[in-house]
Amino acid sequence: MSITFGELVGNFILVTGSVIVLLLLIKKFAWGAIESILQTRSQQISRDIDQAEQSRLSAQQLETKSQANLDASRSQASKIISDAKEIGQLQGDKLVAEATDEAKRLKEKALTDIEQSKSDAISAVKTEMSDLTVLLAEKIMGANLDKTAQSQLIDSYLDDLGEA
């Protein structure tokens, strides 16, 4: 099967003519609809791109706002913790100061009680000594002394004991 040059040119002209006729028919009947579909699709793609850009900007703003809120929350939490530590330190210092004051008060009371006990003991010893001195003096003198003489004797004896 061999094709001649004339047949080849004829087929070429026929196919080319058919394509041209087909393009003319498409342009006349379908090109408006195809162009309309392509333009509608182009507009839809543009709207989708614009919406995507707006969504991205909105998400970026929301992220910035959320980050600012998070930073503010962290700052507040840090301040609350700092304030709690400071209050705890102040309360601890107050408790230590109160305990120190209470210890000083108890120490002073104990010293006062000791001084009072010492004074009471010395007074009791003096009384006992005076009674013993009177008894001893009565035995030595063989007679009872009147109250004035007893008092003078006791005072002089105690003064001698105090100096010794």
From Swiss-Prot:
A molecular-function term among this protein's GO annotations: proton-transporting ATP synthase activity, rotational mechanism
InterPro entries attached to this UniProt entry: ATP_synth_B-like_membr_sf (IPR028987), ATP_synth_b/b'su_bac/chlpt (IPR002146), ATP_synth_F0_bsu_bac (IPR005864), ATP_synthase_B_chain (IPR050059)
Cell membrane recorded as keyword: yes
Subcellular location: Cell membrane
Domain of life: Bacteria
Cellular component terms per the entry's GO annotation: plasma membrane; proton-transporting ATP synthase complex
Keywords: ATP synthesis, Cell membrane, CF(0), Hydrogen ion transport, Ion transport, Membrane, Transmembrane, Transmembrane helix, Transport
Location, primary (coarse class): membrane
Regions that span the bilayer: 6-26
Its membrane topology: Single-pass membrane protein
Function: F(1)F(0) ATP synthase produces ATP from ADP in the presence of a proton or sodium gradient. F-type ATPases consist of two structural domains, F(1) containing the extramembraneous catalytic core and F(0) containing the membrane proton channel, linked together by a central stalk and a peripheral stalk. During catalysis, ATP synthesis in the catalytic domain of F(1) is coupled via a rotary mechanism of the central stalk subunits to proton translocation. Component of the F(0) channel, it forms part of the peripheral stalk, linking F(1) to F(0).
Subunit composition and interactions: F-type ATPases have 2 components, F(1) - the catalytic core - and F(0) - the membrane proton channel. F(1) has five subunits: alpha(3), beta(3), gamma(1), delta(1), epsilon(1). F(0) has three main subunits: a(1), b(2) and c(10-14). The alpha and beta chains form an alternating ring which encloses part of the gamma chain. F(1) is attached to F(0) by a central stalk formed by the gamma and epsilon chains, while a peripheral stalk is formed by the delta and b chains.
PANTHER family: ATP SYNTHASE SUBUNIT B, ATP SYNTHASE SUBUNIT B', CHLOROPLASTIC
Record-stated family: Belongs to the ATPase B chain family.
Stated name of the protein: ATP synthase subunit b
Biological classification of the source: Bacteria, Bacillati, Bacillota, Bacilli, Lactobacillales
